[in-house]
Amino acid sequence: MSEKIYPVAKPVESHALINKAEYQEWYAESVADPEQFWGKHGKRIDWFKPYTSVKDTSFTGDVSIKWFEDGETNVSYNCIDRHLATNGDQVAIIWEGDDPSLDRKITYRELYEHVCRMANVLKKHGVKKGDRVTIYMPMVPEAAYAMLACARIGAIHSVVFGGFSPEALGGRIVDCQSTFVITCDEGLRGGKPVPLKANVDKAIDIAARGHVMVKNVLVIRRTGSPLSWAPGRDLWHHEEAATVSADCPPEPMKAEDPLFILYTSGSTGKPKGVLHTTGGYLVYASMTHEYVFDYQHGDIYWCTADVGWVTGHSYIVYGPLANCATTLMFEGIPTFPDAGRFWDVIDKHKVNIFYTAPTAIRSLMGAGDDFVKRSSRSSLRLLGSVGEPINPEAWEWYYHTVGDGRCPVVDTWWQTETGGIMITPLPGATDLKPGSATRPFFGIRPELVDAEGKLIEGAADGNLCIADSWPGQARSVYGDHERFIQTYFSTYEGKYFTGDGCRRDADGYYWITGRVDDVLNVSGHRLGTAEVESALVSHHLVSEAAVVGYPHNIKGQGIYCYVTLMAGSEGSEELRQQLVKHVRAEIGPIASPDKIQFAPGLPKTRSGKIMRRILRKIAEDDFGSLGDTSTLADPAVVDDLIANRQNRAEAA
């Protein structure tokens, strides 16, 4: 755990929306009287019919979560229409293509027309309020238009990441019984085409076997490559949009009407369709976007996520647009045409706020500083991290090398199920500790409990729960409320269980230690894999590390480490011994790695998450059935890991 503290710098504090005293005052009010606090802040969005009821929530029994229940609004109206009178000519979306020579700027007025036309196309083909629409798109502006068009007419969107296989897509179409799909002919990532329409065709066949018939596929032309076509079912968007009006009135929606379903992996392997609703979600997404990123009018804001993930929903589309921000959408990958792409884009578009994932930060750190140094990055004033705990070494590199030691880093902890950021620094209010998500956002009451469910006070390690509801919270698992209750509310009665382990330090700062199933039990001692990974990555030759447990006949669990080295470094027995010594020195003898496997890469999903399940199987010498590997970005990585596994002696 890093003991370093970076106090809020005076220039940051003087410019920021919230200072320390205000944070403390607002936070105290938000937990003492959530009704009053959210009653006030719920008004940050426009309501067609104002709410009189603010909070009606119960984490026990049948678990019911309702916010602003009698209010009526529309998300698309709040993200577009209400800005037109004063900011219609402001850029809403900057699109940066996969090819560095391609970009587009879309103003709020243009956004209005694009979204209304797409909404009218949906209506023309029979899509009604409450219908589910599946969106399977690359990072092009039309992905945002599709989401906003659904929200405009009250259809429920289910965005499926464009990297998912036809099987995964088909399963998600069946689960929410979607009969309308929006896609592209192809996507482009790192110069390589992604066969989206072909995948949709296969997924529709799979869905038909599950008795769900897709009626229409709306296709956006991206590359112009030839593709198979089903007349009557398949529709070209550019042809359809030309036949409809550029005005579409927003459907008044009740605050608790569903807005979207987003599938997230569950421990059972069957994805859960996390359900978010209209009013509370938008209040929370927009409020966290404004205060966590200290968003001020005129800032250029870039979140590098994909709209297929919750980060893309809340912090590329809904939060920023509700706040009349300029949001950047990036089609490409961080390493194409080379590992300086992020920094080039920051200079090109004068980005002020940059939000990315630790896995990207670590891989760019491994590529060396020259790619960063060739850019100026002088426009940057704030850096953010999302997706997993960031190890202190990557944090320090991000802060000093990317941000030149002048941009606060907001290390944000949250989940698909939370709708928005939960534990985070606020730039003008929170002293920073590298590796810590720091303090709760307004209205969030974190609690640590032990395995028996007893509340732990003060500095401690425990399971992270949230004691009370907040407006952005998911309401259910689509079509399976019982699973929602069992997954999140049955482990610790009356609390939302996050599934994450956490340490609270003496200053009341929170340190996420990783999923509770990523905790090792070594000779009776609890050890978070994130801690061991952090220790390994703090060695100057290590770019990335993943740690899993495997059965050990003396310790119960042994520690198996997969290590990717910095460019130009070679693995050797000598380096292996060095790393063991290094980890012992960082954490203690209990954390001594038993196996270290040098690997050219780690198995990751296309969103950058490490697939630890695969690493566990290989560590256990049980790679015959690796389960669903359809979401792997690079399957060849797995073959290399199996070929060079370190556990054959035990297995033999």
Curated annotation (Swiss-Prot):
What post-translational modification information does the record give?
Answer: Acetylated. Deacetylation by the SIR2-homolog deacetylase activates the enzyme.
The answer to keyword Plastid applying to this record is: no
| Domain of life, per lineage | Bacteria
Cite a GO CC annotation: cytosol
- A matching Pfam family: AMP-binding
Binding residues annotated for CoA, in chain numbering? 189-192, 311, 523, 584
Q: Which sites bind Mg(2+)?
A: 537, 539, 542
Instruction: Please cite one Gene Ontology biological process associated with this protein.
Output: acetyl-CoA biosynthetic process from acetate
PROSITE patterns the UniProt entry points to: AMP_BINDING
Keyword entries, A-Z = Acetylation, ATP-binding, Ligase, Magnesium, Metal-binding, Nucleotide-binding, Plasmid
What role is this protein assigned?
Catalyzes the conversion of acetate into acetyl-CoA (AcCoA), an essential intermediate at the junction of anabolic and catabolic pathways. AcsA undergoes a two-step reaction. In the first half reaction, AcsA combines acetate with ATP to form acetyl-adenylate (AcAMP) intermediate. In the second half reaction, it can then transfer the acetyl group from AcAMP to the sulfhydryl group of CoA, forming the product AcCoA.
Name of the featured protein: Acetyl-coenzyme A synthetase
The gene is acsA
